[in-house]
Amino acid sequence: MKLSKQDSDLFFDLWFSLLDYTNKKYGIDTSTKIINRKTGVNLTSAFRISDKIWEDTSVIDDYLAENELPEDEQKILKSWHYRIKGTFVIERHLKKGAVIIDNEDNVYIVKGLTQSIRDLTCDFPTPVYIKGTLLPFKNVIITDGLIMPYNVIIGGNMRAELKELYMEAKRNDWIIEKMNIDLLDENRHLLKFFKSDISNLSEKTIDNHMKIVQWYLIYYLANQDLRMQDGLNCLDDFFNREVSGSPNEIKKICTSIKKFYKSMAEHNKISEDDYKSLCSEIKENFPRWAEECNL
């Protein structure tokens, strides 16, 4: 339920060094002169500095550019671009980690750092809402150590729904225990191509397209170890399993996915015939998706 001592030591060496760099770069807490394993950092400052890091992870690239690190440590830090920050629910605790559910109903197994998440949140019976950040670390998922439980009572109906989310994920092998970083890196490059191709649109429109495509690439495809090309064959599953909303919202999702694959065709990542087949599938299935997803 927690990292080995060797891995937890490595995490904190990297994490405190990144906190120290970010604090000095942006002057977030001028009263804190240095942050490392020996000095530590108070929680208030840690939350403020970490918020800055997760708000714009380009600071990780800046840190790596100014510090020579072994390749394996660089890979860990680069993987933190794929942090998942937000409000979650700890549904239960297992021997291998905490069962944590995000706002998109994705179910994760998350390990503690120097102590289990069960011990860290022992004053709060499950299920419990928390605010935090999930991080890839080698072949597991952890947090940045800054978990804030909410003292909110979860009613019986909600408890039953959360239990069913976990049981369904377990039955279908949907539980996420690691993040495929190589695949996420590949998708990150594809997203850069796409963003460049839609740069003539308004900032709000670009943001909306990017959020939808990132959701599709990272939280749907990559979580199943599927590449962008694989997505051409599982659109129906995506809409059946992941999507709910009004017909207008479904139309927006279809538009974003079409634009993305058009960009991929223009960059020769898929064939023109593949793109045309995708457009035909969307046109044929949109009425059904719009009806079935309109919950």
Predicted regions and their residues:
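Structural detector for short beta-strands of small beta-barrel domains
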Residues: 78-96
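Short linear interaction motifs
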Residues: 66-84, 108-114
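A structured, charge-rich N-terminal accessory region that forms the first stable segment of a protein
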Residues: 1-71
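Non-catalytic DNA-binding core/recognition domains of DNA-processing enzymes
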Residues: 201-266
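Mixed-charge (acidic/basic) macromolecular-recognition segments
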Residues: 128-131, 135-211
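Flexible interdomain linker/hinge and immediately adjacent N-terminus
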Residues: 275-295
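Short nucleic-acid-contacting surface segments enriched for D/E, G, S/T with interspersed K/R
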Residues: 114-133
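OB-fold (S1/OB) nucleic-acid-binding surfaces
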Residues: 91-114
